[in-house]
Amino acid sequence: MAKEVTVYNNDVDYQSSLAYEFRNVVSKDKDLRMSSEAKIDIGYPTGFLGFDFMNGYKVHNNGETKYNLGISDGSMVMVIGRSGCGKSTFCTQMAANIVRPFKTSTIFEDSIEGGMVKERRMQLSGFNTEAEYKKRFVIRNTGITAETFLARIKYIHDLKLADPERFKYDTGYVDDEGNPIRLFEPTVYILDSIALIMPDDLVEEGEVSTNMSVTRTAKVVTDIIRRVVPMLKMAKTISFLMYPFVLRKLTWCIWNKVNLYLVVKL
């Protein structure tokens, strides 16, 4: 005997749906983690066309904008390459091209690299006056630990969410009801080396060579990344993490595999 199946009409009244009830409740909630709903992802061009193409995706079947090229807002990107291959140069230029069109966008960087001095950043980024540099870059080269990395990401997140209209811009898109979609202007955070984010106590004690320290550091870094990702997405922050890796000498290339990029040179 065939089982009777009830077929529901997809064109039901919106106000009778669970989606309507949920949005009606959370719209009264001041906690943006509950009331903010994703409507669109924006890709930000980096100035490297091959890189932007690999990160692109189709966004509309109709209208003027059919493709979104560049790095999506809220992304975390790992850039891998051996020492001296150009990771810092690559990330600095990408970051500058992402933030340049926006009024409030800033590049935060944790770096201990001696060669990447202010003058070199100014040259690479094109922000070559003191006023432009001060507006666009916030650099830290001491006190970098797992805890302070998380604290700075959270601080950026909290500042933007506390005054959203100050940091938002009109994307040029509209939602299903015809209302303009306004999103946070992108922020870029560069971490010079993933190895910098070690626990506070291990940095103070100098326990960097024991097996226990390595295991503990890995656990802390995993936890930090897990906690950082939602804040990056909410505050439209793009994070570049660099990792030194010894490789055979190859021609310069960028290899894409799930937000993992390889940068090497002759």
Regions found by a protein language model. Give the residues of each.
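Residue-level preference for the first positions of well-ordered beta-strands
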Residues: 76-78, 106, 186-188, 238-239, ...
